[in-house]
Amino acid sequence: MMFTLHRAGPADVADIMLLETSTFGSDAWSPAMMLADVAQPHCYYLVATSERSSELRGYAGLLSPQGAPDADIQTIAVAPDARRHGLGRQLMLALLSEAELRGARRVFLEVRADNPAAQHLYDTLGFTSIGTRRGYYQPDNVDAIVMRLDLAHGAAQKAEAGSDD
């Protein structure tokens, strides 16, 4: 399965929210929160469509102010039928490349402790666990594992070359 990525804008938020609510349920962002983040100049959001249709198959967002040393993966979601086809990796690599272009030296993220598939993806990209935020995801009271990737020049390309997907 092949996917096309493009920069998300306000017009994409309705489709993003369909996947957001079906993926994250009680943890889902509100439409207003998503719209504010997508429209924010320090954020970079991508949407992915299947090459066979224009239907949204995934999205991901990065907070990375130009020149700031730290960036944060805000969110990532992949539709169930598009999982295990490399789309999560493709989205993450694109965000890591953008973080590098904006001058970030470190990228952080939080991942649910009960999501081993996402944890594995982040491990293969070179992220390491640096701590736990107890009860971070509410109302489910699920812990968040905090992860960090120290970027070196070309880190995204190196991660892509080392892909096991």
Question: PLM features: residue spans?
Answer:
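Acetyl-CoA-dependent GNAT
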Residues: 3, 7-81, 92-94, 98-102, ...
